[in-house]
Curated annotation (Swiss-Prot):
<protein>
    <recommendedName>
        <fullName>Sulfate/thiosulfate import ATP-binding protein CysA</fullName>
        <ecNumber>7.3.2.3</ecNumber>
    </recommendedName>
</protein>
<keyword id="KW-1278">Translocase</keyword>
<keyword id="KW-0067">ATP-binding</keyword>
<dbReference type="Pfam" id="PF12857">
    <property type="entry name" value="TOBE_3"/>
</dbReference>
<keyword id="KW-0547">Nucleotide-binding</keyword>
<dbReference type="InterPro" id="IPR005666">
    <property type="entry name" value="Sulph_transpt1"/>
</dbReference>
<dbReference type="InterPro" id="IPR027417">
    <property type="entry name" value="P-loop_NTPase"/>
</dbReference>
<keyword id="KW-0764">Sulfate transport</keyword>
<comment type="subunit">
    <text>The complex is composed of two ATP-binding proteins (CysA), two transmembrane proteins (CysT and CysW) and a solute-binding protein (CysP).</text>
</comment>
<dbReference type="InterPro" id="IPR003439">
    <property type="entry name" value="ABC_transporter-like_ATP-bd"/>
</dbReference>
<feature type="domain" description="ABC transporter">
    <location>
        <begin position="3"/>
        <end position="237"/>
    </location>
</feature>
<dbReference type="InterPro" id="IPR024765">
    <property type="entry name" value="TOBE-like"/>
</dbReference>
<dbReference type="GO" id="GO:0015419">
    <property type="term" value="F:ABC-type sulfate transporter activity"/>
</dbReference>
<dbReference type="Pfam" id="PF00005">
    <property type="entry name" value="ABC_tran"/>
</dbReference>
<dbReference type="GO" id="GO:0043190">
    <property type="term" value="C:ATP-binding cassette (ABC) transporter complex"/>
</dbReference>
<dbReference type="InterPro" id="IPR050093">
    <property type="entry name" value="ABC_SmlMolc_Importer"/>
</dbReference>
<comment type="similarity">
    <text>Belongs to the ABC transporter superfamily. Sulfate/tungstate importer (TC 3.A.1.6) family.</text>
</comment>
């Protein structure tokens, strides 16, 4: 079942949480709402679920207006960050809860409930824990039980609010890949909130970048990473250097360095900022003929397969960060304090707004 929101707005006092947000999610899509704290992503998720009401706009499921439909009638599965499992109930009872509290006319028989719960526990690969209590489970196991409970009511859509936020990094990575495989089996529209860029880019079909209550960009993980639509998206999706220069007729310049600026074909000495990823900066020793930004190597941080270099520009001491493979760094024999040239290889150029 598809999900569509049209012109959603929401205020909490003077704070505007959502500002005319519109979005369409197809059946079977796994979509991430990604952004910093306070950007509106959780508010949007809760309005879709029916846990929050909008000041304006509408929510449609499969083309039908669900804005005024009670949360209990929306057939939405919701998974919270902190599991919200009932401590006094076993795993089996937690998963069965949503089925047992249905109105008598809609409640399955106890035999069907048992079969359904055991099927779901098998689906999340935890059927052997049916008689345990939440306190006896790991964080990853609790989150999978919470997901099984959400699926028990056969939701038309699945909504997850930072489902892996309370887990350590290794478990998060394992669970999000497991969620991707599970989602492909279920084939329902699924939306999850996260502030983890890697998480959103790794497992989703599309990423919705949000900022200050608005959508900045919607696209596939590859699209938003390779072609960020705004400076905010560029900065939020990873480390980035901002180099201030000028653009003229589609070319950005800073000293001897020139880079294409295809989005500014009519610019005439216009102030513009080149956004450059650390791994898109090459290094050369000072005195070579190639153009570059004169810098001095301040510090080197080695982390696994990469070396992260902190470079200070020689004109204004502004910091430029570069990332190179550790074997290359070793072969170059660079020393802290050495004069170098930073050579941006690729960038996205945005005009400075007056």
């Amino acid at each position: 079942m598809s999900i569509e929101v049209r012109g959603l707005s929401k205020r909490f006092g003077a704070f505007r949480a959502l500002d005319e947000v519109s979005l369409h999610i197809e059946t079977g899509e796994l979509v991430a709402l990604l952004g910093p704290s306070g950007c509106g992503k959780t508010t949007l998720l809760r309005i879709i679920a029916g846990l929050e009401s909008a000041d304006a706009g509408s929510v449609l499921f499969a083309g039908e207006d669900a804005t005024e439909v009670d949360v209990r009638q929306r057939q939405v599965g919701f998974v919270f960050q902190h599991y919200a499992l009932f401590k006094h109930m076993t795993v089996f009872e937690n998963v069965a809860f949503g089925l047992r509290v249905r109105h008598r006319s809609q409640r399955p028989s106890e035999a069907r409930i048992r079969a359904k719960v055991l099927d779901l526990l098998g689906l999340v690969q935890l059927d052997w824990l049916a008689d345990r209590y939440p306190a006896q489970l790991s964080g990853g196991q609790r989150q999978r039980i919470a997901l099984a409970r959400a699926l028990a009511v056969e939701p038309r859509v699945l909504l997850l609010d930072e489902p892996f936020g309370a887990l350590d990094a290794k478990v998060r990575k394992e669970l999000r890949r497991w969620l991707r495989r599970l989602h492909d089996e279920l084939h329902v529209a699924s939306v999850f909130v996260t502030h983890d860029q890697e998480e959103a880019l790794e497992v989703t079909d599309r990423v919705v970048l949000m900022n200050a209550g608005r959508i900045e960009q919607v696209g596939s993980p590859r699209e938003v990473w390779e072609r960020p639509a705004t400076p905010f998206v560029y900065g939020f999706l990873g480390d980035v250097n901002q180099l201030h220069g000028h653009a003229t007729r589609g070319v950005w310049r800073l000293g001897e360095v020139a880079l294409p600026a295809p989005d500014l074909p009519e610019a005439d000495n216009q102030r513009a900022i080149a956004y450059v990823r650390p791994h898109d900066i090459d290094l050369a020793r000072a005195g070579t003929a190639a153009p570059g930004i004169p810098v001095r190597l301040n510090h080197v941080y080695l982390a696994g397969p990469s070396a992260y270099l902190e470079l200070a520009r020689q004109d204004d001491q502004a910091i430029i960060e570069a990332q190179v493979p550790e074997p290359l760094f070793r072969s170059l024999g660079l020393k802290e304090g050495e004069a170098l040239l930073a050579q941006p290889r690729r960038a996205r150029v945005f005009a400075v707004q007056p």
